[in-house]
């Protein structure tokens, strides 16, 4: 039996293709607004319907370099290593089993949450975990969506509730990200300078590997 102190851990997945300053700013915002002990960052495997821009290993290397100076961010490569499609519920089950003494909260953007009913076994997923939905200014969850009905049932404004129990959903307003990974890839392809959007270490990896060209 472990004697480790129970922790409040955020789980933040993404394709990170590439990881940029917007992603690192989100993590910074989360620690400022939510009493998290650490955040597990999980680079996703490329979904079957999308052609990879760069290899999974290169994305993992960029994410690792972006957060290498943080003591409170852990990079988890389990989905990158899997050859089969990775589903959020499978990853969550593994993390719950690995962290029986800790409280976990899943972190996602409002666009992803608005389509939660398209996730594999989504009804089981939401019963297993509390969720933080990061909401951009002026973005609303469509009233006709399943996600909106979930909010009617499970919405909380009490951040303390997230560290216990399950099935609670907190809407968290964050500073908007001014750039997307898609825009960065397009700019690199066109030969534009993207250094203002990337951490220096990530920019160096992209230039050194001639990625996204």
Each language-model region and where it sits:
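Nucleotidyltransferase catalytic core that binds NTPs
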Residues: 1-213
């Amino acid at each position: 039996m472990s004697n480790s102190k129970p922790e409040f851990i955020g789980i933040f997945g993404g394709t990170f293709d590439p990881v940029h300053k917007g992603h690192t700013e989100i993590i910074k915002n989360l620690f400022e607004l939510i009493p998290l002990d650490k955040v597990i960052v999980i680079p996703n495997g490329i979904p079957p319907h999308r052609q990879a821009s760069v290899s999974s290993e290169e994305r993992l290397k960029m994410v690792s370099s972006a957060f290498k100076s943080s003591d409170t961010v852990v990079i988890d490569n389990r989905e990158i290593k899997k050859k089969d499609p990775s589903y959020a519920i499978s990853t969550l089950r593994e993390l719950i089993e690995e962290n029986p003494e800790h409280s976990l909260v899943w972190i996602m953007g409002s666009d992803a949450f608005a389509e939660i009913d398209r996730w594999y076994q989504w009804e089981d997923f939401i019963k297993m975990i509390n969720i933080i939905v990061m909401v951009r200014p002026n973005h609303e969850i469509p009233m006709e969506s399943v996600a909106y009905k979930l909010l009617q049932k499970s919405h909380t404004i009490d951040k303390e509730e997230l560290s216990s129990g399950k099935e609670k959903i907190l809407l968290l307003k964050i500073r908007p990200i001014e750039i997307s990974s898609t825009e960065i890839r397009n700019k690199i392809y066109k030969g534009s300078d993207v250094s203002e959007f990337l951490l220096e270490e990530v920019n160096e990896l992209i230039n050194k590997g001639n990625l996204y060209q």
